[in-house]
Amino acid sequence: MLDIKLIREKPELVKKDLIKRGETEKVKWIDEILELDRKWRENLKKINQLRKERNQLAVQIGKRKKAGEPIEDLLARSNEIVKQIEELEKEVEALKKKIDYYLWRLPNITHESVPVGKDDTENVPIRFWGKAKVWEGFLESFKEQSLGKMDYEVLSWRPRLHVDMLELLRGADLERAAKVSGSRFYYLLNELVILDLALIRFALDRLIEKGFTPVIPPYMVRRFVEEGATTFEDFEDVIYKVEGEDLYLIPTAEHPLAGMHANEILDGKDLPLLYVGVSPCFRKEAGTAGKDTKGIFRVHQFHKVEQFVYSRPEESWEWHEKIIANAEELFQELEIPYRVVNICTGDLGYVAAKKYDIEAWMAGQGKFREVVSASNCTDWQARRLNIRFRDKTHEKPKFVHTLNSTAIATSRAIVAILENHQTEEGVVKLPKALWKYTGFKEILPASMKEKCCQD
């Protein structure tokens, strides 16, 4: 939520930012907010003046009573003032509701470094890491996607898609999951179960080493938490509701972590607060019909390790760089080639002032796919959830800044591992960083395991 003071003092800045975001229909809202705010403040002033007059009347009534003089005229005026105040208070409340309606539906103000663009095709790659395995048929496309800035190894054989690897390894049962739960669900099987859990522990260990406090949050939260952490559109497109209850299944650990300190005033000396949340995530994926319908890349349920930071406003941009660096280190240890993308205004979403994505090279698909998002939400969530801090007892509290970043979303990390670390024979060679967590170094195709058993 935006600060009303910002709209009062810099309305043109807010309008220009809305235009950059492509939210041109909301530009007129700013003038409407200013007019409503003018009336709201005007009515508050009238209420204060009337209260002052009523207090003065009370003094006069007291004096007249002592003097034995009539007070009927003063009482009549006092009663009239009470009615006027009641009417004005109703108007003030109605005006406040209208102002809040707009404020709660305005996006965050973007950072000056965010590129202007209409959609994800105009996101800007800013750095690349790793040596990509590229099938010769994908080579020209790869060079274009990597801007010629990434090392690569040309393969004469085409790496399998992760969905084919799942079948080859007997690592998941999608058919039976569809029978039991519908589309975009899966049974994870055999070594991939161990791999999923290994990825969680791997990410947790690395972030705990960096001072993050591990948290398993509630998997359901109340509506006020979701309203504070995300946009109203997500209630239709993303979030599952528990019927008959004021509870929603979390789409990410970010949301219960954002709500953890709702309506609190934090001690400034405790900042930054660093949390690493571990949870399942539940998402409707409405509006994605036809996208990634096969496999486990885009699903209704998955595990995720999430970084969450409460910081001082002046430190939040430094922390934004730190949390994306943390995620990069994880994917470097997993030996997954990737690019970091600066998300443009048209793809940014309402919550973030700036967002980086890590897009892993998927050797089977021949394209980069999102595996991490890292956002600086500045004070947008903190205002909605009323999370403040102060350094001294009697100091006026200020709003914190909140930041979040994926560490590992296990299903997407598994997709990246299957597509990048497979051999021509279909063996998956696991990165060394995971060996101590899995207890094995490779995953064999089911047919090879059967043959080994027979031999």
Curated annotation (Swiss-Prot):
A family per Pfam: tRNA-synt_2b
Record pathway: Aminoacyl-tRNA biosynthesis; selenocysteinyl-tRNA(Sec) biosynthesis; L-seryl-tRNA(Sec) from L-serine and tRNA(Sec): step 1/1
Biological process according to GO: selenocysteine biosynthetic process; seryl-tRNA aminoacylation
Coiled coil (residue ranges): none
Transmembrane feature ranges: none
Main location: cytoplasm
InterPro entries tied to this protein: aa-tRNA-synt_IIb, aa-tRNA-synth_II, aa-tRNA-synth_II/BPL/LPL, Ser-tRNA-ligase_type_1, Ser-tRNA-synth_1_N, SerRS_1_N_sf, SerRS_core, tRNA-bd_arm
Broad enzyme group: ligase
Gene3D superfamilies to which the protein is assigned, alphabetical: Bira Bifunctional Protein, Domain 2 (3.30.930.10), Serine-tRNA synthetase, tRNA binding domain (1.10.287.40)
Binding site for L-serine: T252, A253, E254, E306, T406
Binding-site list for ATP: R283, K284, E285, V299, E370, V371, V372, S373
Catalyzed chemical reaction(s): tRNA(Ser) + L-serine + ATP = L-seryl-tRNA(Ser) + AMP + diphosphate + H(+); tRNA(Sec) + L-serine + ATP = L-seryl-tRNA(Sec) + AMP + diphosphate + H(+)
Quaternary structure and interacting proteins, as annotated: Homodimer. The tRNA molecule binds across the dimer.
Free-text note on domains in this protein's UniProt record: Consists of two distinct domains, a catalytic core and a N-terminal extension that is involved in tRNA binding.
Entry's family note: Belongs to the class-II aminoacyl-tRNA synthetase family. Type-1 seryl-tRNA synthetase subfamily.
Protein name: Serine--tRNA ligase
Organism, as annotated: Thermococcus gammatolerans (strain DSM 15229 / JCM 11827 / EJ3)
Gene behind this protein: serS
